[in-house]
Amino acid sequence: TGRGSAYNEYEYIGFGITLDQGRDMLAEAEELLIKAWTGKNIDHHGHYWQSKFPELRPRPYQKPHPPLVRACISEASVAEMAKVGRPVLIGVQTVDTLRHRLDLYRDIMHDAKFSDSQVEYSLDQTWVQRGLVVAESDQEAQDIAGPALDRYRKHLLDARLNYNTSEVPVVDPSRPRPPGEVLEQAFLAGTPRRVAEQVDELRDIGARNVMLNANVGQIELQHVERTLRLFGEQVIPKFKDA
């Protein structure tokens, strides 16, 4: 089960709360979720929720409860999850940052006295994120991914300008872009051979799973379909025995 706090203020406005309140609510939401999955005669008195019910039906099939996975952008969130041995979904970061965070995650789990097998299990369930464009040439892939990322970034900026309240500071356009808005960091893009090299690079730093988005910024359907076909036929087979 995935849980994540959103990262845009406007995503909270419809619920009548702020982004900071949403972050504070996350821990209690997970606590209540586990109580509901595992307990009976639930009587929860928290800061945000007051809940009382006999039990959840039907009961979860997985025991003691479905595994929880949290989407994490910040290093602090990754460290927090490592302390409790929970897998994470890491948003787009540079290769060097990913290497550091995966090493940090492993070290913190060991410091928290998790066994080697528990650390390996959590790393096996941890994912990193990238966009994906596979084409006949590296240049064509860049020509598709670049404008797509620009459209995606414009959508985010427009939504923040249109829907954030006046109390929310406007992002300084001169500030360096975060990794998720930088083409070379946000995408695996190129020929099947080049994309396989990029996957290899992620594997070499300790990433074991990659969440891929083949339609960042409303890429045209024929390009999305070609990406999926080329990736499935010419990239995935290179890693089947890995």
Question: What is the meaning of each model-derived region?
Answer:
Residues 137, 219-230, 240:
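Short glycine/threonine-rich loop-to-helix capping motif typified by GTGT followed
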Residues 5-9, 94, 132-134, 216-218:
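Active-site-proximal loop/turn and secondary-structure-junction residues that shape catalytic pockets
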Residues 73-96, 101-102:
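A conserved active-site cap/scaffold subdomain adjacent to cofactor or substrate pockets
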Residues 1-3, 68-71, 88-91, 124-131, ...:
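Hydrophobic faces of well-ordered beta-strands that scaffold small-molecule active sites
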Residues 20-56, 96-208, 240-242:
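An alpha-helical appendage that flanks or caps ligand/catalytic pockets
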Residues 92-95, 213-225:
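Glycine-rich, proline-tolerant flexible connector loops at the mouths of alpha/beta enzymes
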Residues 6-17, 83-84:
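Acidic/polar active-site rim loop that often engages polyanionic ligands
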